[in-house]
Regions:
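Phosphate- and other anionic-substrate recognition elements at nucleic-acid/protein interfaces
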Residues: 1-87
């Protein structure tokens, strides 16, 4: 039996991230780490944080109408696997 990787497979070293989205800030939880990191919901803060993330990490966030879009777009452009969930 052979297995194949798909475009949505996480890269080696990738992490799973959950993001609670707000209009002014993002609360970020990383699987295996204790606590939550709060970032301003701005291009600069998000881009800086994404530079420290392993390529191909999986980032899941709630659909908030518009406030999630900045994180979703920047994460996608940075090579992350992005899930926008509609609760």
């Amino acid at each position: 039996m052979t297995t194949s990787t798909t475009e949505t497979s996480p890269a080696s070293g990738a992490v799973h991230v959950g993001v609670d989205v707000g209009s002014l800030h993002l609360d970020i939880a990383i699987q295996g780490k204790t606590g939550v990191r709060r970032l301003p919901n701005t291009d600069t803060a998000i881009s800086r944080w994404l530079k420290d993330m392993p390529a191909g990490s999986l980032i899941a966030m709630e659909s908030t109408g518009r406030y999630h879009r900045r994180m979703a777009e920047l994460a996608h452009l940075a090579g992350m696997i992005v899930f926008v969930l509609d609760p």
